[in-house]
Amino acid sequence: MKAQDLQFTQLLEGSKQFIIPIFQRTYSWEQSHCQQLWDDVVRVGKSTELNSHFIGSAVYIPETNVDAAIPRWLVIDGQQRITTVTLLLIALKQRLEAENLDEPISAAEVEDYYLRNRYGKGEAAYRMLLTRTDKEPLMWLVDGKEPGEEGSYRIIENFKFFKEQIARADLGDVWRGIKKLMIVDVCLQQGIDNPQMIFESMNSTGKALTQADLIRNFVLMGLKHELQTRFYNDYWRPMEIEFGAENYINEFDEFMRYYLVIHTGNVRIRKGDVYDEFKAYSRKYEVEALLDSLKEFTGYYCRIALGKEKEKGLAEAFHDIRELRADVCYPMLMEVYQDFRQEQIRHEEFLSVLRMVEGYVFRRAICEIPTNSLRQTFATFMRQVKKDRYVESVKAGFLMLPSYRRFPDDDEFIRQIQIRNLYKFNRRSYWLRRFENHRRKERVPVQDYTIEHIMPQNNDLNAQWRADLGDDWKRIHEQYLHTLGNLTLTAYNSEYSDRSFAEKRDMSGGFKESPLKLNQGLGACEVWNESAIKKRGENLAKAAVDIWPAPNLPEDILHAYKPVPPEGTSYTISDHPHLQGGLARELFESFRVQVLALDECVNEEYLKLYVAYKAETNFVDVVPQARGLRLSLNLNFPEIDDPRGLCRDVTNLGRWGNGNVEVRLEKLEDINYILGLVRQALEKQMGEDEEV
């Protein structure tokens, strides 16, 4: 590798061609980047004290024999700034040409020195060759032609920006500023330097690369040019097209995170860690096999998450799940989609699984069960699925989920859906649409209707409403206003919302004439009071069980899926000498009661040398000692929030118990504080830092 400080203009001088590899992202600098460059050029050009201005690096590697008449260099880093200064040079050339100026430099000199190779034929005539949609627009500009409308928007708009700036600028200042631009010129040697490692280490200015950019470059950069082109055209470009331009920018990183969750089993990959995780994962696979897998799962993701599914039943199910905003289930659904494509399940079985997932997420939301465990649940769910008993094993998996991860049963769901504030429920349009269109052949456009409170929202109800509700009207209004029994859809104007129930029922377009399923029965109702609201709420709640059903299996079948307890020696408190009395026993009894009360999912297990408390797995282990208890918290030391500094980092130290945080409990007055530390370990295991 050869690196040197160099004037930017010297980089472009001489017969050569800089080529942007096909896998590199297209030109993406925005006007703000161009404005900054322009301001720097003018500032340094006007200054008699500033002799240079550093704009970053240019890293390139030979594509062909460097001794060729016109050597070709593949740009590894610096595409954005080289392209942008080239646009500035074209704008400068055009003004010099238009005004027939020879000072401070002639248009012919700009073209010969920096833009064209005089003796190059065809594309070899251009000093810089961009990729894909950027390629022709830059060539047209160098040729003095107007780019077509189908060309790169950024190339054209940024050229126009520089043309406008140069039109009113002092050309002497501009040219002096351009000549003072400096770069770090890094020329790599083919077969010796690793362009990917160098690319990653560059601390470049400009627009940050996304995780997707880094992954694409990592996969394709080390290949020969012919393979780069084939793999890009056969695999990566189809993925970009499948996503679409905007979704590729906004969604690809998230897709890659879910892809890695599926294939690595690591459910805690954060968006900023996707690239590093991918590099570690990719080393096990040939490039083409890896790209083929990415392309396959791109198809699944786009159908599930981006509405690209063509089959009607699946499209409707995916739409419902998207409207629930249950993105965390996508890893599971992509795996199920793969099984469907491989004919391990039939179409109706696939739909059954999708509706179970939908019901699981919606029932939990209605029952206000914290969402924090969902990411872990869905990321690991497919490990227990038996491909020869697919739907049965999915049902069993949902039915065996414990406490905070449970699938709410019918009793809990019916009870909660009647009392929830469904008007302020953040999936309001979803549940209204699902209620109205369940088992309908012709879908009702729910978005054309407005949500209606049958008993009005007005806290100061009129005399008729007070009479209908009775003496206890204030309590009834407060208790039932936003609940299932009092909410419906209407097409009439909201100005009628305070009218009496009889008027709403009998008016033109009122409840009696409503074609909506949600309004069935309201036309025959004589009075709207607490009894009527409760009855309607009960009826709709029973209907909800049919819309969002819970899985069901005979007990003998479900029992076969339950894990068999391991055989071996069992221990009790009597096997721990330090727990037979004294302070350690007193501390332990107080501690265990409060730990078990943290959540109903917490289990206690006596082992030979310590007592384990676990939800999914151990989150705190208690080692009884003569003077108290030694606790091992299943956290990495940097994760613990310990204002009093009681914890000790035991990373890489041999000990009994799990985790890298140790704390001693030797005084009863410390129990509440230490329970706060223990809760952190439990919350991490339950995924309380994750949201749907």
Give residue ranges: language-model regions:
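Glycine- and hydrophobic-rich flexible loops that cap the catalytic core of alpha/beta enzyme folds
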Residues: 2-267, 507-515, 519-533, 539-558
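Short, conserved beta-strand/beta-arch hydrophobic-aromatic motifs that form part
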Residues: 605-661
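Well-ordered alpha/beta subsegment
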Residues: 653-692
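Secondary-structure capping and boundary motifs in well-ordered enzyme cores
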Residues: 68, 76-81, 175-178, 187-194, ...
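A cross-family structural signal marking well-folded subdomains
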Residues: 212-215, 220-431, 524, 528
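Amphipathic alpha-helical segments
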Residues: 582-601
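A short, surface-exposed helix-loop junction/capping segment
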Residues: 16-20, 565-581
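Betabetaalpha-Me/HNH-type nuclease active-site subdomain
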Residues: 43-71, 105, 382-522, 526
